[in-house]
Structures are given as structure tokens and as C-alpha cells.
């Protein structure tokens, strides 16, 4: 077993060797290096064919028509294109948007930008388990609501929203529904031929494909229109200009093909490992599960260890690659906004760790992690005056701390 152990698959995944091998064939002179938009020679035709195959592989995983898949530079761009693109196109109908407080920053900051441009955004607070209350969502819908953006799987706590029901609610009112499916695609079944979802964002690098490539699903029936955010040669049916990066697209296609084949067995395996990890730590004192095991993605476990500083815990667990919060916001020392939105105290949010498992995680690694966590928590709590006071029965919430 090699240390450190990678348990941060929700931040990124290693590229599957099968994917890397495939990508190598689309880079050099002796490979297929042409521009898929070059229509006048074989180099272009071969590149275009490779892109078509990948587009099909992505569409097949999610039950879409390949013509509904638009390539982007990643899920952040897909979120921007979906939300700004739909808001700008449909603003004559209304300027009200609904999202949730626990969305990814790529959705929240895009909505904030639209607010600066004169749109009105309602940010729903989830219930304490992270699930959106559908009655609250319904109450927030108005005649001038044009767009709802609620994610499938939360990247920090792994809870799964009921996108099927939300889609029905939106379709009944003629509201466009966007789903950020970055953390769910290839892990949970998605069938866009059944779901009433109009726009869906995908990433390559969360599912063993390369970084820097993603896609946006744009429904054809009923037809959804979006305004392009990047202008140029009119690639991707005018929705996203720019020369297509064939090697990245082929890599994403291969990753999605593998995911379709292996998803069922892989998810059962990961669910077992995640439960093994939780069962290994849940009997410790003052340990809390954030999110919901029943309504949770099989590969994410977010746990708070009370009376232990999250930063010191991460240092103590240096042999485990884990995160507090998400990689996108872990550079700031603020407690996770997702956990705060669940109504958690700053202290508890600060002591939370996200473990995310993946294709190369083994049972041996999980057992090593459990042992390390138990030892580290014990040691850090011995050093903690707060833990000592708590053990003596002092109510820490009632103490007036002096601010120096």
C-alpha cells in the first residue's frame, strides 16, 4: 500500500490508464491530430469522426441525443453557459431565478453576476440533511420565474436531490430546469429521455477523464435556446465557439464509455467501502455525519469531529489526502458555506472532513484510514482544552469568550 492514500476523488480523479492511452492517439503527426472543423481533407474528417464517437459515448451514458451534447472547457463553463445563456435568452419572459444555497460556486457566482445585471435570484436553504424542501421550492416559483438551477449530487456532503420531481414541477409551469450533474454522472443512473431536465452540466475529470473538458446537455424536444457566451467560428451549433480539443474530447468519451460499463458494480463496491469507513468511526464520541447516508451518493462521506480543529486534523492525517470543504473553496479558511447552510455551528463546520472514494480505493486503505483517524482524534483531543472542559460538563455555548 502506497502512502499518502488518495481519498479526495470528488476534487479530481486520476485519468484511467485506458483513457490516457486513447488520448495519446490524437496528438502527434502519426496520430489523428487534425482540426475537426477542417472539412476539405482527411485529417479533419478523421478528427471529426473521433469527436462524433465521443459525443455518442457521452450521450449514451445519460440517455440523450448526441446532438444535445455541447462541448465546453469544463463544468464551470457549462454552468455559466447554461445559466447566463438561458437567462439572457428568456429574459423577456421574466427575470426571476431560483437556486439553492448549497450549489457549487460556479452556479452561485454566476447567479450573483446575473443579480448585478438586474435579475432577481431566490436562494433556497436546504433542510438540515441537505435536501431541498420541495414545498419551499414550489412556494418560491412565480409567474416571472424563468430558470431553476438545483444540482444532482452535492460535492461536499454527497446528498442527492430529487431532480425527477423538481423537473416535473418546472415543466408544469414552463420553467427551464438546469442541473449541475458534475458529481453524479457515471455514479448514479441518469436518463435524460425520462427526466424533465432541460440543461445539464458534465465534467470530464470527476470521472477518470482529463481536466479541461466538459459538456452541456441542451434539450432539443421541447427545444431549449441559450445565448452563446463565447463568440467566434460558430462551433457546436453556434452555442460555444472554439476549436474542439480532440484529444480531450476522446478522453472524456472513453471515460464515459467505461463508466457506463462499470457503474453498477463500481457503485456497489464504493457504497460498501464508504459504509465500512463510517462504521469504523461512528462509535467515537462527538462524531457527526453530515448529509444523509440513505439519500447520499455512494462515494462521499462528510464527517464532523467535534472539539478538533479541521486544519490540525488535516495536518495529523497527512497520510490521507482528504479535504475540509471542497477543493474549489478550501484555499480560504472560512468554514464551508455548504455546512453553514445546513444550520451547523462554525465550530462543527470547521471540524468537518470530506472523504471521497473512487475506482482505485481499496479495503486495505479504508482500514488504514480508520485506524489513523481514531488515533489522531484521540491525540488531538488530549491536547484540546475545549475537549477537557466538555468532558468536565462545562456548557461551552454559555461561555462569554473575550475577544482580544
UniProtKB/Swiss-Prot annotation:
Its EC number is 2.8.1.7. It is an enzyme of class 2 (transferase). GO terms for molecular function: 2 iron, 2 sulfur cluster binding; cysteine desulfurase activity; metal ion binding; pyridoxal phosphate binding. PROSITE patterns: AA_TRANSFER_CLASS_5 (PS00595). Its cofactor is pyridoxal 5'-phosphate. Coiled coil: none annotated. Pyridoxal 5'-phosphate binds at residues 75-76, 155, 183, 203-205, 243. It catalyses: (sulfur carrier)-H + L-cysteine = (sulfur carrier)-SH + L-alanine. Pfam families: Aminotran_5. It is found in: Cytoplasm. [2Fe-2S] cluster binds at residue 328. GO terms for cellular component: L-cysteine desulfurase complex. The active site is at 328 (cysteine persulfide intermediate). Pathway: Cofactor biosynthesis; iron-sulfur cluster biosynthesis. Its main location: cytoplasm. Gene3D superfamilies: Aspartate Aminotransferase, domain 1, Type I PLP-dependent aspartate aminotransferase-like (Major domain). The modification N6-(pyridoxal phosphate)lysine is found at residue 206. One of its GO terms (biological process) is [2Fe-2S] cluster assembly. Homodimer. Forms a heterotetramer with IscU, interacts with other sulfur acceptors. Master enzyme that delivers sulfur to a number of partners involved in Fe-S cluster assembly, tRNA modification or cofactor biosynthesis. Catalyzes the removal of elemental sulfur atoms from cysteine to produce alanine. Functions as a sulfur delivery protein for Fe-S cluster synthesis onto IscU, an Fe-S scaffold assembly protein, as well as other S acceptor proteins. Belongs to the class-V pyridoxal-phosphate-dependent aminotransferase family. NifS/IscS subfamily. This is Cysteine desulfurase IscS. The gene is iscS.
